Amino acid sequence: MIFDGFIKNFIYDPVSFIGILIFYFLLINLPISLISLFNKKSSSYVRLITILINLFIALQLISRWIISGHFPISNLYESLYFLVWGITLGQLLIEKEYSTPIIPAIAIPIELLTIAFACFVLPEDLKLSSNLVPALRSSWLVMHVSVVMLSYAALIMGSLLSASVLFINNSQPLQLRSSSMGVGGFKISNSYSTNNVIEPINFSHSEELDTLSYRSILVGFVLLTLGLITGAIWANEAWGTWWSWDPKETWAFISWLFYAAYLHMRISRGWQGRRPALLATSGFFVVLICYIGVNFLGVGLHSYGWIFGIFNLF
């Protein structure tokens, strides 16, 4: 009987059914990821569940694409799942580069909160697929919005990694030797061998996380730049103007300036230690305002037309 109910729910509303399933997978994965901080044998289970979550989100988005007939990133509900898909992908790629239980332990809570927000806080009418207005029926929708959402995912991962560096070193001075250019755990030694060969040195745990944070933010910055460029081209084609200072456009530009300043200080000024980690961590809130915060206004071309119904919750 229970199995029959699952089948009926899947057939009737596959998108919502898979969405709830993803929430429960994350709910299971959260305590396992915290346990893995003390018992590394649990890390393989965390990675397996994360892969399943990533695949289920892909299945959900493909299902919505088939049902709606357009790329499934046209409303807040769809974009939240796409964002978590990007974060889980980033989590898996970063873990492949440097395996540590800290990475899923900091990423999974954000993934769970995001999916919980999409499942249980958003109004039901915002979860439904709707027909696109003529201006959005463009191949630029796929290119622009997906690139911007992936940039958010990369920037969020970078901020979370920097936060983990600060947390690990909260009671001691933070001295990092990691290279801003991200040389993958190698650094030019001050001493040379008899054969004039530059020898690699091992980075500490915090230095590895700091380097990964820098790399993630660099990827996110490049994607955000591409997102702004494609958005400007699309806006000119659709509305005849490259830039309209829409609230979302303005905050996307502020985010771009913020991370440009961070990268400039890391590369040109050689920033090391606590200051760049604090700046990168605060970038999480910049992205949060850019992505979610402007929707409080309920205005602009990029708004989903929804103001947080907090007064309806009481």
UniProtKB/Swiss-Prot annotation:
Q: Where found? A: Cellular thylakoid membrane
Keyword terms of this UniProt record: Cytochrome c-type biogenesis, Membrane, Thylakoid, Transmembrane, Transmembrane helix
**Molecular function (GO) terms listed?**
heme binding
Q: Which GO terms describe its biological process?
A: cytochrome complex assembly
Report the Pfam families cross-referenced here: Cytochrom_C_asm
Note the topology in the membrane.
Multi-pass membrane protein
Q: Where are the transmembrane segments?
A: 15-35, 48-68, 73-93, 102-122, 148-168, 216-236, 250-267, 277-297
Q: Which GO terms describe its cellular component?
A: plasma membrane-derived thylakoid membrane
Chief location bin: membrane
What binding partners and quaternary form does the record give?
Answer: May interact with ccs1.
What is its biological role? Answer: Required during biogenesis of c-type cytochromes (cytochrome c6 and cytochrome f) at the step of heme attachment.
Tell me its family. Answer: Belongs to the CcmF/CycK/Ccl1/NrfE/CcsA family.
Q: What is this protein called?
A: Cytochrome c biogenesis protein CcsA
Which organism does this sequence originate in?
Answer: Prochlorococcus marinus subsp. pastoris (strain CCMP1986 / NIES-2087 / MED4)
Q: What are the leading ranks of the lineage?
A: Bacteria, Bacillati, Cyanobacteriota, Cyanophyceae, Synechococcales
